[in-house]
Amino acid sequence: MIYLDNAATTLHKPPEVAEAVKNAILTAGNASRGAHGVSLSASRMVFGTRSRLAKLFGCPRADHVVFTANSTEALNIAIYGLFSSGDHVISTDLEHNSVLRPLYDLQTRGVSVDFVPADRQGNIRYEDMETLFRPETKAVVCTHASNLTGNLLDIAKIGAMAHAHGALLVADASQTAGAVPIDMQRMNIDVLCFTGHKGLMGPQGTGGLCIRPGVELRPLLRGGTGIHSYDREQPQAYPARLEAGTLNTHGIAGLHAALKFIEKQTVQAIGAHERALMRRFYDGVKDLDGVTVYGDFSRSERAAVVALNIRDYDSAEVADALFADYDIATRAGAHCAPRMHEALGTVQQGAVRFSFSYFNTENEVDTAIAAVRELSE
């Protein structure tokens, strides 16, 4: 099978990831829940993973790296932890439902939300965002890259704009962490939300958020933390403030191994390889008769994603044919990005998304190009 659905999850991981998970299952105790050897060793591994993530993302403090099950949970913690009735939020049409649905829910609770519109290429105009700020604007919540088109937003520019208006920036790095360099301080990010199972090449069930010192988030969950057990309130210090209950220590061990792999290969090299494959595929399909490709490919810096349609064929039928006849795995449909499909005019048809990873090859890309060519004839 040729797996080209890496924007959903990376199927092929560094071999040391599975080995680390297996070893943790056999040897890891409950981190921060004991003073015996297996608990302490698990605690050291968890803190080591926080430290590697802080270094990777330019987060000023490792203890401000909070673990979650995925980026959806991280975004819910950030969104529900920041906003109250009377606040105003700015977001964009590029967002995933992990941002949209919490914001829609908050609209029913007295929070006002404005969305920066996207054009037919999936781009926004930053001057449109500038006009939306109000005195009560508390934050911009936006993705770093569209999971449908691969277009990047200029996060540093958005963060600077938000800060100039006294607002925060919450960035969703689900599609960029591990493949696009991120520096919270340089890019003016106040809260960075990420998942571990995509570009970071870790196990499913891992993710988190990095929080700039001085940013206060209300806990979404409350419960055991292993510290201050006689207090009725959740501990105030990060990370315990937002980490109630036992962590996914086994998954974090796999993420730790994946981060070591990324450090060795470098984010720059991983991203360059993925984008080269993406560009090879794009160049091979963009001029095919009957094929429509979505997104802006004029910039070299983007996520390694190509979304397309073939004539008026239902995207699900195309994806089914790719898998049944060519053994190529892709993703069809709405991709949890309804506003983006509205902007692109693909609500009814959806789109077929090809997404590339560090472990894909040029031969796999060429096979996928040939398959699209045959289906379009």
What are the roles of these predicted feature ranges?
Residues 1-377:
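Pyridoxal 5′-phosphate
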